[in-house]
Regions:
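N-terminal loops that bind phosphate or other acidic moieties
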Residues: 2-134, 138-380
Length: 380
């Protein structure tokens, strides 16, 4: 075995993809010292997507002052690549849930304004190509905060300018984009997301995600009504119907809210990573792909990171072995095309112990070593 590609997603709540790959690499090096090992950063559009891209592309890190979800000053950073032409921005760095104490979370009052400030900063630096990862937000403002920071105005029925927060979507009567930053006309945005929810409705942004962001049941209804109303206003102003567009409900409606006003497209995070980092070229001469995530189940094959990896492996006729902290539906996963699906737990443990980072890394190392030892016997 001459070349193994390590393409692990994070084991959420336990260990990140980089550390998982390091543990796997150690085991392979001990058993197959002459094997070429390629570590490939993976994420599916949620937290870690832009970090994975910045790491792999050796991005220049720049910092700027913006506003957090409650419009308090905060310093954030993002990556610049391609000789200053492309900015890689993590939405959550300016308006993510971790920025707000759990008892203060309220998507009626939060805004994506800071993300727009990050984009404006990148435009000043000359960037015209953008990748924005939109997982983990504390907002439900459909992106009006970001657009306001870039020059848009949202007016009520009395021509008063609205604060760009979730509770005001229902009040939007007019949209004024005449003062949008002119550099946006020559810019392109790839919006990387990890969900396919529509803009509103029972499977939409408010009903599915607003409770995690602090909304009570009445606020969920208000936010959903706001999204419905705003989608209709957008349709009247732009003739674009975003209501049931897959992914439009990502990040509190930001997924769909940007499309009518920017040269933007929604893509799954894993597709963005695989395309940007040319994963297929990496895999083409490989003998094996090792991948994995915290839990392997039927959802694994539904547009998530491992599904993208598997499809490339199948195209290049390279076997794919997946490791998981917990494994369900093994036969279904095999039918999807995985060569093998293996749990890393050596014996029954509590969830707390299973999630302990050192325990997870030890289990990855031990399991990978056993996989490689079997392979050695059949490739002598």
């Amino acid at each position: 075995m001459k070349k193994i590609v390590l393409a692990f997603d994070s084991f959420k709540g336990s260990v990140g993809s980089f550390e998982i790959a390091k543990a796997a690499e150690k085991a392979i090096q001990e058993e197959l010292p002459d094997c070429q090992i390629i570590r490939f950063p993976i994420a599916d559009g949620g937290e870690g997507t832009t970090e994975a891209l910045c790491s792999a592309l050796h991005a220049q890190t720049v910092s700027c002052r913006v506003h957090d979800p409650f419009m308090k000053p905060i310093e954030v950073s993002y990556g610049i690549v391609n000789n200053g032409a492309m900015a890689i921005i993590e939405m959550a760095s300016a308006c993510g849930l971790p920025l707000i104490d759990s008892n203060r979370r309220n998507p009626m009052k939060t805004t994506t304004y800071g993300v727009g400030e990050m984009v404006a900063d990148a435009l000043k630096r000359g960037c015209r190509e953008f990748i924005i990862g939109i997982g983990g937000s504390a907002t439900n403002d459909a992106g009006i905060g970001m657009l306001k920071a870039l020059g848009a105005r949202f007016l009520d029925s009395g021509n008063g300018e609205l604060e760009p927060v979730g509770e005001n979507l229902i009040k939007v009567h007019q949209i004024d984009i005449s003062q949008l930053n002119p550099a946006l006309k020559e810019s392109h945005f790839t919006i990387a997301c990890d969900v396919s929810n529509p803009f509103f409705g029972e499977e939409g942004a408010a009903y599915v995600y607003a409770p995690q962001k602090g909304a009570n049941s009445l606020q969920v209804i208000e936010l959903d009504n706001g999204l419905r109303h705003y989608a209709q206003v957008i349709k009247e102003y732009t003739n674009m119907d975003i209501s049931q567009l897959p992914g439009a409900g990502a990040a509190g409606g930001m997924g769909g809210g940007l499309l009518p006003f920017l040269n933007a497209e929604l893509q799954s995070g894993i597709e963005v990573i695989l395309k940007t980092l040319r994963f297929e070229e990496v895999v083409r001469q490989a003998d094996l792909i090792l991948t994995g995530e915290g839990k392997l189940d039927c959802q694994t094959g539904m547009g998530k990171a491992l599904d993208g990896i598997l499809r490339v492996g199948e195209k290049c006729q390279v076997p794919v072995i997946a490791l998981g902290g917990a494994v369900e539906a093994t036969e279904a996963l095999n039918r999807m095309g995985f060569t093998a699906v293996l749990p890393i737990q050596p014996f029954p443990v509590t969830l707390e112990e299973a999630m302990r980072p050192e325990f997870t890394k030890e289990n990855i190392e031990r399991t990978v070593r056993q996989v490689v030892r079997v392979i050695k016997q059949f490739t002598k």
